[in-house]
Amino acid sequence: FVDINDWIDGRQIAKHRTSIERLMRELGLTTRHDFISMARCLALTDTFWMKRADEDISWNDVSLYRNPFDDVIARIAFDGTGIYGRQNSPTSPEFATSGSFAKCWVREGDQVSLLKRGSEGYANAGFEPYSEVLAAEVLQAAFIDHVPYTIENFHGKLASKCPLFTSEKVGFVSAHRFFDGPFDVEDVLAFCDAHGGDESFREMIVMDAVMANVDRHAGNYGFLVDNDTGGILRMAPLFDQNMACLPMMMEHDDFDVYLSMIGPKIGASFVSIARALITSDIRAKLVALKDFEYTDPGMGYPAWKLAAVNRCKDRMIADILA
């Protein structure tokens, strides 16, 4: 970051989500000073935090890795319900959790997990949690580093669930943070080459094509870093594939027409960018995936949609390898 005020504002990244914006308003978090006093600028991506110079408080008192989360704030973040007007704990990661979908962090014993809902309000809404599970399944079959996902009902809402992949020792920095201005695929490849190799980035791009992931962007992939030194360790495991595997497709949609209307955020088309970045090792993975079939994720997932997702996988692999 260039300016400390910009950094603080960035820690309030979740405030555009309706429930979080309402919560921050109810808690009186209207200024940077309010936000620092209440939330300490804490996040689960690193170990930075803030306090007043004269404040008698330590990292052990506020760490999101060491303290219980505020269940009320988590519930509000997830579905917009909860108890307002009460004293809330500062140890909540919700204020600094990015993304437009309603979500919350929960601690179950030593495990911290993210629960994320699907969309609402229209006929083809709500399939995004299934997409996370399906994407994780094909990434597992391809032996590609990824965050595992399951699906469950949480407070009566369908949600995907995945474990936290950072810790007090290892943090996460999204890709766009490493570039001062606009950047393209060649810039990212060069950056990866300078930090251990570009195979993982190439795998991500090709597998996004296989999964028809329409929402891969520089905020939902990045690198693991040493929280003590800031040094880059490696590319982070793949996560946030809730817009892969045709979540918005409807039963009456023509398959070929639908595929022709969607594309990636990185590259001109799924097939062209995958062909440009594929390597011999990745090609071998795609050949092996010809025999792979997605399994029913359960929880009411429609049979027609499962068939469409498998058909999409077959089509994408055939076109990439052609």
PLM regions and their residue ranges:
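Phosphate/dinucleotide-binding and metal-coordinating scaffold of catalytic cores
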Residues: 1-212, 224-322
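Conserved protein-kinase catalytic-loop segment immediately C-terminal to the catalytic Asp
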Residues: 217, 222-225
